[in-house]
Amino acid sequence: MREVLYMTDKKNLRTPIVCVMGHVDHGKTTLLDKIRGTAIVSGEAGAITQHIGATEVPIDVIVNKLGDPKLRDRFMVPGLLFIDTPGHHAFTTLRSRGGALADLAIVVVDINEGFKPQTYESLQILKRFKTPFVVVANKIDRIGGWASQKDMPFAATFKKQSPDVQGRLETKLYEVIGELYNQGFAAERYDRVTNFQKTLGVVPASAVTGEGIPDVLMVLLGLAQKFLEANLQYSAKNPGVGTVLEVKEEKGLGATLDVILYDGTLKKGDTVVIGSLGEPIQTKVRALLKPRELSEIRYESKFKQVSEVTAAAGVKISAPGLDGALAGSPIRVATEETLGEIVAQVKSEIDEVRIDTGSVGVMIKADTLGSLEALVHEFQKDEVPIRKAEVGDISHRDAVEASTVEDPLYSVLIGFNVKVHPDARDFLQESTVKVFTSDVIYRLVEDYQKYVKEQQELAEKKIFETIIRPGKFKILPGCVFRQSKPAVVGVRVLGGVVRTNADVMLENGNVVGKIKGLQSEGENIPSAKVGKEVAMAIEGATVGRQIKEEDVLYINVPERHAKVLEHEIYDSLSTDEKETLDIFLTLKRKNNPFWAK
């Protein structure tokens, strides 16, 4: 690596918080599993992370992975605290005053599959919060002909591959790098980066064989020390400050909180203030359950009770009255002297998240404050009006409220990572309310955009079905089959569309009759488009008087319809319809310049 990423001054730095992001099945949990040296993944259904967790990886374990004991003194951070969760979910949950709490992120991409929806979502969120991250181009062991070298640094294993295999890896790697450029990130293979502030490092690796994992750890530690020194400084004497990651019911404990402590110290018996939808919760810590090093928060049997924890750490808190606590909300230690001030601060932070809503718009529900913020941000970016935005599952009350909205564009419920209550589901099945649920934010945005387009097309279709459209036709020579009552003539459609029951006019503006019928090859038809030659019955016209062979006639579009055609659905008309309408309007406006304006 060309750029030196070490520091020499000892600082009181806390453990950096690292969020692992990426698409399902691209190897997030396997990567962490390799770093930890435990076998968590193998015990999970489908090898997909099922629960949010946090794992502390001490610096000694990391140095051991790097294989160079001398590095111990070069790295000042005490280790890395990994948050492990599907996609980007924990990243948005881990929030502090609307910002991201994670110090660093890893975006895992399957080098063979490339970018997927949650990959793009992760990048968008990281860009928004300006979080430093490293990209792991995972599953290099699946490149055709790859000779795996267990746990080797990337440079060493790369040298052992044949030129053909090296070429295949470079091709796939630069497809990943190219897509990062498309997303607005300058990127390069990590060992070719000369300035990590300007260029994103991409580490080819295999979470299964361990190849490249030492490099991932090295880059993370280097980034933490080079760019996050100020963020990581803390004082153990400070009262604890953290974020609620998840609210969980536990046997024998009731409601508990999984918390990421990012500043100060939290002790058993401390008074804590926690955000809720109502007034902040004030309670005393009954028990602190901390995972042993290299064990997951989500494996309860591996907890040990501790008397205190110091940032940064993942800890489970047992305390009375936690039922109303919100995932993503702040938790702060308070003393008798500071209680009033802390309650006001926590309430203020929750109030900041209350979304500005209007009298019209969609309803949004999300599972945490952070994901609600992220979801609302994306919809507001697309200028979608929001009537209501709340944390929680979709309830019967939500369903009833949405059903009272008449506009189909806003009779909509959007749910991120939430359930639909059974009574709400029953009600919704009988209603016209549209419901979108997903665990990918931008899929919700895309699905809603698609729905809006469908509704607009449906509305246009209804208009098209009722609107008399422009049409132009010519009476063909030698094709007068009947002179009057009604006149029956052969015509060629020159533009637009001709339909039965439409009035027709000459180029001088005179209305000469109404189309009573159309026939093609002896069959009655309702309409005929440009280029068609058909027989037309015109009631009210007599050939030789009002009309004659080779006359060009137009559908006499009513003024109200002409306004809609010109001002509302003009872009939806075909080219020949537009040309025909333009000529028709010119003819009409010769005598009345303001006609249909």
UniProtKB/Swiss-Prot annotation:
UniProt keyword list: GTP-binding, Initiation factor, Nucleotide-binding, Protein biosynthesis
Residues covered by region (G4): 138-141
Gene Ontology molecular-function annotations: GTP binding; GTPase activity; translation initiation factor activity
Keyword DNA damage: no
Region annotation G5: where it falls in the sequence: 206-208
Entry's Gene Ontology cellular component terms: cytoplasm
Domain of life: Archaea
Annotated spans, G2: 47-51
GO BP: translational initiation
G3: region residues: 84-87
Gene3D superfamilies per record: P-loop containing nucleotide triphosphate hydrolases, Translation factors, Translation initiation factor IF- 2, domain 3
Binding site for GTP: 22-29, 84-88, 138-141
Residue ranges annotated for the tr-type G domain, each copy included: 13-229
Region ranges (G1): 22-29
InterPro entries in alphabetical order: EFTu-like_2 (IPR004161), EFTU-type (IPR029459), P-loop_NTPase (IPR027417), Small_GTP-bd (IPR005225), T_Tr_GTP-bd_dom (IPR000795), TF_aIF-2_arc (IPR004544), TIF_IF2 (IPR015760), TIF_IF2_dom3 (IPR023115)
Similarity field: Belongs to the TRAFAC class translation factor GTPase superfamily. Classic translation factor GTPase family. IF-2 subfamily.
NCBIfam families: aIF-2, PRK04004.1, PRK14845.1, small_GTP
Protein function: Function in general translation initiation by promoting the binding of the formylmethionine-tRNA to ribosomes. Seems to function along with eIF-2.
Name of the protein in question: Probable translation initiation factor IF-2
Organism: Methanosarcina acetivorans (strain ATCC 35395 / DSM 2834 / JCM 12185 / C2A)
